[in-house]
Amino acid sequence: CSSDLNDFIGFWWPILVWPWLLVYPLKMLGNLLVFKKIRAMLGKNFRAGIAGGGAYPDVIDKFFWAVGVNIVEGYGLTETAPIICVRPIVDPILRNVGSPLRGIQVRVVDDDGIILGKCKKGTLQIKGNCVMQGYYKRPDLTEKVMTVDGWFDTGDLAVLTVNNEIQLRGRKKDTIVLMGGENIEPLPIESKINTSRYISTSVVFGTNEKHEDQRYLVALVLPNKDEIEDYAADNKIEHSSFEELANSEAIKKLLEHEIAELINSKNGFKAFERINKIAIITKPFEVGVELSAKQEMMRYRVAELYKDKLRELYTESK
């Protein structure tokens, strides 16, 4: 028995320890040069920051996690007055928004209203004294979101983890259904694409300008102007305007390569989630045009404004 234990330790020890020994010096160096200074700016009494009002970008969440700054993400809606849950300060779990507050019930259901078990993705529903009675003088809208037994349908896709924490997975109305029947949530794909230094914003589509389902995904991409111009200078790409530069073949190939390196099986994406084609746009999104007052992207407005580009993406030869 002792020999078996020694063999077990001898096998796993280098596998577990060596990666830690390689990473730890880098972590200490980062802490000394950068992270420690960031934490010092927040003061000695800082315990945690709060994020809310919109989806908390995964790249920012990971950054503060690495820095050692605790950010607790909250989730709620106006219809739930408004807070449903908050990521705990003690033992927070990345990407989770915490367990429901006292007095609030949550469940996840499928498209037929059947309650799903733990770790199954579906639509998040809420019940409790915090939930509204209905929309003022709009029984038609109330009927769409309230069940007969008092559950409010948030329209958000979520998973309940084994420890009863909520993990948001996107908006149900944003779900893309391809011609092959594949269901795709665009937000995780866009969030990953937007981690590229060369990309400011991206919008993923699976329908053409007539809102007809297609066989593959495409994306509208807004380049990061400063990074693209630096790249052009380093690579001696001549241009007379940013519009000309952004739409040049060299920049298009750069952005396509960036997206291909991010959206692939190595990063957990399926083959049908890859971006088949892109169209480059150069006008930043504005509140009241492509963005809501809460800075949230209005996909239907983007689709309408750039319907000509969507038509080209789905009609030009592959």
Predicted feature descriptions by range:
Residues V106, N164, I193, A219:
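Residue-level signal for inorganic ion chemistry
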Residues G155-L157, T175, S196-D226, K266, ...:
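C-terminal boundary motif of the adenylate-forming
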Residues V131-M132, E165-N194, E227-E249, F269-F272, ...:
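Adenylate-forming
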Residues C1-P92, Q105, I199:
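Gly/Ser/Thr-rich phosphate-binding loop
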Residues S2, G76-T80, T154, M179, ...:
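Ser/Thr-glycine-rich phosphate-binding loops at phosphate-binding pockets of nucleotides
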Residues I176, V203-G206, R215, E256-K318:
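Conserved C-terminal "lid"/linker of ANL adenylate-forming enzymes
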Residues D112-C119, T123-L178, D213:
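Conserved ATP-binding/catalytic segment of the ANL
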Residues R95-P100, M146-D149:
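Short Gly/Pro-enriched turn/cap motifs at secondary-structure boundaries
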